[in-house]
């Protein structure tokens, strides 16, 4: 079975197999960045106790994986409802995109959501983000084409590049006090986005954060940075009553 893998000094860097239910070989210590990226033949993944680290975007856009399993003796990783987390529950590493679920609740205690965790996940209509989350990485929700509304807790200070780009069914976004920055293309090509509620804590918005959001109205307090941004970028503005 090891012939299906390229393993260098304990790191699994490439996969040559036929997919299906994948068992990572025991003894593998880490999985390289993008090792299985865009592999549509995988349907499930078992991670042995020996794996201590999974690289960035290791399972990016593996859209037919219905579940991850992790050896109960693994000291660094675990699976919760088929999704891959750090053992201490603070990091969401991979969402099993092959599930048919239309809603997902990120577990309380998660502080960090990795790059592209939900990218091009076409089933999700609703995602609940707890106020323990502090960082959502690049393109985490990009191309979630059925996602309709999202509320982002104020614990997330920065919305990074393309985090919700191409969410074409998204109609409403609510940010909460504490968020400070809306980054490059954060909501680009959200072509049905009609309303975003922006708190006074936001002090910087990248110029193309709402590129191709032609139906958008920005809701914020009068005199806020968000009002200034809306006027400078010819985006309709509606003042929130104090």
Segment roles from a protein language model:
Residues 1-8, 16-30, 39-53, 63-90, ...:
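Structural signature of tandem-repeat unit edges
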Residues 33-35, 56-58, 93-94, 115-117, ...:
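Consensus positions within tandem repeat domains that build extended binding/scaffold surfaces
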């Amino acid at each position: 079975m090891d012939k299906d893998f390229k393993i260098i000094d304990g790191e699994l860097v490439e996969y040559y197999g036929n997919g299906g239910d994948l068992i990572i070989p025991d003894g593998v210590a880490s999985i390289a960045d993008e090792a299985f990226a865009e592999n549509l033949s995988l349907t499930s993944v078992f991670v042995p106790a020996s794996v201590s680290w999974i690289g960035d975007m290791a399972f990016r856009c593996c859209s037919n994986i219905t579940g991850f399993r992790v050896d109960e003796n693994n000291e660094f990783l675990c699976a919760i409802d088929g999704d891959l987390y750090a053992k201490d529950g603070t990091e969401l590493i991979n969402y099993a995109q092959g599930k048919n679920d239309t809603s997902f609740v990120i577990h309380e205690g998660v502080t960090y959501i990795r790059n592209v965790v939900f990218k091009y996940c076409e089933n999700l209509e609703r995602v609940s983000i707890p106020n323990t989350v502090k960082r959502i990485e690049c393109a985490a929700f990009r191309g979630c084409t059925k996602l309709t509304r999202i509320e982002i807790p104020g614990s997330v200070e920065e919305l990074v590049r393309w985090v919700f780009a191409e969410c074409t069914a998204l109609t409403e976004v609510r940010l909460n006090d504490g968020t400070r920055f809306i980054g490059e293309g954060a909501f680009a090509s959200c072509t049905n986005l009609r309303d975003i509620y922006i708190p006074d804590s936001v002090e910087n918005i990248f110029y193309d954060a709402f590129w191709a959001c032609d139906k958008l109205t920005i809701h914020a307090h009068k005199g806020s940075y968000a009002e200034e941004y809306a006027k400078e970028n010819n985006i309709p503005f509606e003042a929130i009553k104090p």
